[in-house]
């Protein structure tokens, strides 16, 4: 807390506060130089596990081939279904409540990637698929991510609750797209 107050009083740019250390210096234009590192771009958060995965800084996560340059896809570490994938924007976006109307295409692209990944894994019964987002404060990671689950008819009791269609804590991708358009 004291370090944060010192950093604010030193005139650090807001982007630099998170990476500021005792060795931080401020140049005449107010840029951040923490141990020789440049400030993080606003679309990257070094404390976010999904940002690190997108930046290929987590060698333990296998990225699935994704033909969209703005998105990544990988298997959920605690799968609720035989096919449980996460489709994640490379740029840091907080959650589904922070989305704007002009980001409908992003969500549509996430759904397209999810369907493509399922097809590549020989799952084509799209009537037995659930795609959606957890609503804050029920997001385990504060980086937008689409859950792609199949087959839905084989979800366990708890998973049926956790991924319940358009509940207080989970919204389907189709419903989110509809809400963003209105």
UniProtKB/Swiss-Prot annotation:
UniProt-reported outcome of changing residue 36 to A: 2.5-fold increase in affinity for indolepropinoic acyl-adenylate and cytosine; 2-fold decrease in hypoxanthine affinity; nearly no change in affinity for adenine, guanine and uracil
Catalytic activity, reaction form: adenosine 5'-phosphoramidate + H2O = AMP + NH4(+)
Annotated AMP binding sites: 76-77, 145-147
EC number: 3.9.1.-
Top enzyme class: hydrolase
Gene3D superfamilies attached to this UniProt entry: HIT-like
InterPro entries listed in its UniProt record: HIT-like (IPR011146), HIT-like_sf (IPR036265)
Protein family per UniProt: Belongs to the HINT family.
Protein name: Adenosine 5'-monophosphoramidase HINT3
Organism: Homo sapiens (Human)
């Amino acid at each position: 807390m004291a370090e944060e107050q010192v950093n604010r009083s030193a005139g650090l740019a807001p982007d630099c506060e998170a990476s500021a250390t005792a060795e931080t210096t401020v140049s005449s234009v107010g840029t951040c130089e923490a141990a020789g590192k440049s400030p993080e771009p606003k679309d990257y958060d070094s404390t976010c596990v999904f940002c690190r995965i997108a930046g290929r800084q987590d060698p333990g996560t296998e990225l699935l081939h994704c033909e969209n340059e703005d998105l990544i896809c990988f298997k959920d570490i605690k799968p609720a279904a035989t096919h449980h994938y996460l489709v994640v924007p490379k740029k840091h976006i907080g959650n589904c409540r922070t989305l704007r109307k002009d980001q409908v295409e992003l969500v549509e692209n996430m759904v397209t990637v999810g369907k493509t990944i399922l097809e590549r894994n020989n799952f084509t019964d799209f009537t037995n698929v659930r795609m959606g987002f957890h609503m804050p404060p029920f997001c385990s990671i504060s980086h937008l991510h689409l859950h792609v689950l199949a087959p839905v008819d084989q979800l366990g009791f708890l998973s049926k609750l956790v991924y319940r269609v358009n509940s207080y804590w989970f919204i389907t991708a189709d419903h989110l797209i509809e809400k963003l358009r209105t």
